[in-house]
């Protein structure tokens, strides 16, 4: 009898890669993947615990999935990921429907958990937080067939005071260049055209392999040699190790997207110090000036935290003025989340939730206006775009949805082509001219 598997992957793209590896292991064991949880014999929930809202979403998703033990075919519920790693005792005690917990380094033990379920036992597998997958692992790609995430490192050594990730993901550890290149070659052979390189701290790639010196530029040089890969994008570029050599290869290598995602979190020096960030405002400004002065335009994305403990109105205003001055192309804003087990979470000068929300909306409003201005400046320009899906438009027309080369999957806006007929299909990369720019999206036409 065929065994069916349902899954939900929450949180970041790094978590999604872990999910895809677990799916690959289970498929090799004879499971078929279904989108209908009601029909699934086994359900896996890969959880996130980065902020409070992510915890709430994870708990609610687990409880919803548990209902399929009564209303569906589910015989086993496996909970994996960061929430499992951090709250294993509480989850096992308070949600008895959970059959197995798998920690962040134990994804390769998913079959051990399944075997325990088949024998009527509950299991909690948390060892090996030093683990990291490699090219030999089976993996079921859940993203569109032409774009895939590649995790080049795991864990983090930065110790930001607001973040629990080092405790639940372990110390920073890199895959070898050979392993990553082999995986990218395999993805290319399956039809992938865009790879998105990810890690907790992508610019630190290789420091554990090369006596404290990053190897990211060396990795990029090897990946650009892989035939079939047309776009290489990087996310989570921590500013400390962002070198001139890295900027140079981004600017000059055609396959590399002219796109830089630098999570700055704040710019006030006192706040940065309290966050245990290594870079000062002056360091940040020097780096951004280099990027802005590059001979080729490089899209700038960042992420910011508002409402960090003790953040004053003046410090928040400094942040707002900085954002207005730099004019990031894209920005993600998060309200500070008080996390158990973190230094910042133990502070007594927490900012009231209503103040954090007000600051969030203020900064998002500022950025929306900047993004709209930036996108309007694109009107009349020509860029490459990747088609992601076709939708039915008005009056029986076909609407193509996709991304410019300057837009990352999942986190940025979209590009739309109206009335494209049968000229394009998902996965196509083609030249387009931007006709209209809005706060997050653009409308374009095909360059014939």
Sequence positions of predicted segments:
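Proteins enriched for Cys/Gly/acidic motifs involved in redox and nucleic-acid/cofactor modification
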Residues: 1-205, 245, 256, 260, ...
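Generic beta-strand/beta-sheet core signal
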Residues: 8, 80, 198-200, 235-237, ...
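Radical SAM enzyme [4Fe-4S]-AdoMet core and its adjacent flexible, acidic
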Residues: 12, 206-224, 228, 274-275, ...
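Glycine-/small-residue-rich active-site loops that bind phosphorylated ligands and cofactors
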Residues: 14, 50-53, 83, 239, ...
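Conserved SAM/AdoMet-binding glycine-rich loop
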Residues: 76-79, 86, 91, 189-314
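Conserved, mostly hydrophobic/aromatic
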Residues: 160, 180, 197, 234, ...
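Contiguous mid-protein beta-loop-alpha structural module that forms a pocket-lining wall or clamp
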Residues: 311-318, 325-328
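Terminal RNA-binding accessory module
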Residues: 346-448
